Amino acid sequence: MQKLVIHGGSKLHGEISISGAKNAALPVLCASLLTAEPFAIQNIPHLRDVTTMLALLEQIGVRILTNEPGTTELSAANITNPTASYDMVKTMRAAILVLGPLLARTGQAHISLPGGCAIGMRPVDQHIKGLQAMGAEINIEQGYILAQVGRLSGARIAMDVVTVTGTENLMMAATLASGTTILENAAREPEVIDLANCLIGMGAKIEGAGNDIIIIEGVDRLHGGSHVVMPDRIETGTFLTAVAACGGDVTLIGTRADTLDVVLGKLAEAGADIDIGGDWIRLCMQQRPQPVSLRTAPYPAFPTDMQAQFMALNSIAGGTSIMTETIFENRFMHVQELTRLNADIQVEGNTAIVHGIPQLDGASVMATDLRASACLIIAGLIAQGETIVDRIYHLDRGYEQIEQKLAQVGAHIKRIN
Ligand SMILES: CC(=O)N[C@H]1[C@@H](OP(=O)(O)OP(=O)(O)OC[C@H]2O[C@@H](n3ccc(=O)[nH]c3=O)[C@H](O)[C@@H]2O)O[C@H](CO)[C@@H](O)[C@@H]1O
Ligand SMILES: C=C(OP(=O)(O)O)C(=O)O
C-alpha cells in the first residue's frame, strides 16, 4: 500500500496550478446522460473518482469518444443499462447523481442506496422525495432505488435540508420534465452554478442557480456541446492553508477567489497577507498563525470540506480555537491522528476545542477520508521530523498530483510503496 513520507519544517515558495474541481466534474459527467449528442468536457481533473465515474457511465452504455488529459468527450446515444450497482456507489457517493438524469432521459433507473460512509450518514431521502413529487414511482428493494416514470412533470419542491447532490440531481431531472420545476431551499454552492451553466449550454432553461430558489422550465431534449469545469476551490483552499501553516509565499494559478470568500477571510484572520487577481491568489505568511474559530455550514458559509485542513493550522496557532462541524456527524476522525503528532485537541459533540502548541512532532498516522488526508499532510509539513501518512488511497479520490504540487513549492514529501 502506498504511503507519503513528509519531512516537515520547510517554508513554501513558488507557484501551483489548480486543477478542475472534483465536485463539479462529477455532476457534469452525469449531465452527459441527458443528451443523445456528443458532449465534451474540459478541465477534468485526473482523479480516481473521475475514473470510477467514467467506468460507471460506460456500464450504463455511454461511449467514451475521447479521453485525453484535460478533455473527455462522451456519447450517451444508447443508454442500455440504467443501473448503478452498490460496488460503484459505495466507492464514490457521487454515483447517486446518475439517478435524476437516467430517470429523465429513459424513464427508469435502478440505483444502489449509498448508505453511510466514514464521515457520516449520507441519506438521499430528499432526492427521492423530489423525484416522487415530479411523478416518479419509486420503490426501495434490497438496498436499491427502483424508479420509473413515463415523463417527469415539473413540481414545486421544498427541500427540508440544504443538499448539494440533491439539488444537482433534481435540477438535472427537471431539465427534461414537462412544465416548470421550482426548487426551494436549494444549495447555493459554486458547483451547483457550474452544473447549471453546463446544462444551460446544452439548451436547458434554468434561472436562479446560486440562489436558494432555482426555476427550471423543462424542454423536450438537450443537445450536445462542451463545458469547461470550474477550478477546484477545495484544492485551492487546501494549498492556501498549507502555506498559512508552513509560512512562505505562494501564488495559486488558474483558480477563482470569488468562490472562497469565507475561507480567505479566515486565512487573513490567521495572519496571512492575501492578494487576488482575475485567476490567481497569492498568500504570504510571515508569522505564527493566530487561532481561527469557525462553524461549517452550507455555502456561502465555511465549507465542511475545509474543516480538517484548518484544524491542522489551528493546532500550531498562538491560542485556542473552537471548531464546529454541522454538516457531517463523524468528520473529526483526523483529531485522533493529529494527537499522535502531539496536537492538543478535545472533542465535545460536534465541536473541537483546539489549543495551539508551538510545534507538532512527526509520527506515523493513518488517513481516514479525503479531507482528513489533506489535514494530515499539512500537519506533516509543519511537524518537526518525519511523518508517514498511510492509507493515502483516499487522497487520490480528490487531489491531482498533490505531492508533486507541494514538492514544487519546496515541501519535502514523497510517495513510497
Ligand atoms: C451542504 C454541504 O455542505 N454539502 C456538502 C456535502 O455534499 P453532499 O451533496 O455529499 O451532501 P449533501 O449536501 O447532500 O448533505 C448535506 C446534509 O444534508 C443531509 N441530507 C442530504 C441529502 C438528503 O437527501 N437528506 C439529508 O438529510 C446530509 O446528511 C448532510 O447532513 O458533502 C460534500 C463532500 O464533503 C461537500 O462538498 C458539500 O459541501
Ligand atoms: C467527502 C467528499 O467527497 P464525497 O462526497 O464524494 O465523499 C469531499 O469532496 O470532501
UniProtKB/Swiss-Prot annotation:
Keywords, alphabetical: Cell cycle, Cell division, Cell shape, Cell wall biogenesis/degradation, Cytoplasm, Peptidoglycan synthesis, Pyruvate, Transferase
Modified residues (2-(S-cysteinyl)pyruvic acid O-phosphothioketal): C117
Originating gene: murA
UniProt-listed CDD domains: UdpNAET (cd01555)
EC number: 2.5.1.7
Cystine connections: none
Pfam families: EPSP_synthase
Name of this protein: UDP-N-acetylglucosamine 1-carboxyvinyltransferase
Residues that hold phosphoenolpyruvate according to the record: K22, N23
Any one annotated GO CC term: cytoplasm
Recorded coiled-coil stretches: none
Signal peptide start and end residues: none
UniProt-annotated binding residues for UDP-N-acetyl-alpha-D-glucosamine: R93, R122, P123, V124, D125, Q126, D305, I327
Organism of provenance: Nitrosomonas eutropha (strain DSM 101675 / C91 / Nm57)
Lineage, highest ranks first: Bacteria, Pseudomonadati, Pseudomonadota, Betaproteobacteria, Nitrosomonadales
Role summary: Cell wall formation. Adds enolpyruvyl to UDP-N-acetylglucosamine.
GO molecular function, one term: UDP-N-acetylglucosamine 1-carboxyvinyltransferase activity
UniProt record similarity statement: Belongs to the EPSP synthase family. MurA subfamily.
EC category name: transferase
Catalytic reaction(s) noted: phosphoenolpyruvate + UDP-N-acetyl-alpha-D-glucosamine = UDP-N-acetyl-3-O-(1-carboxyvinyl)-alpha-D-glucosamine + phosphate
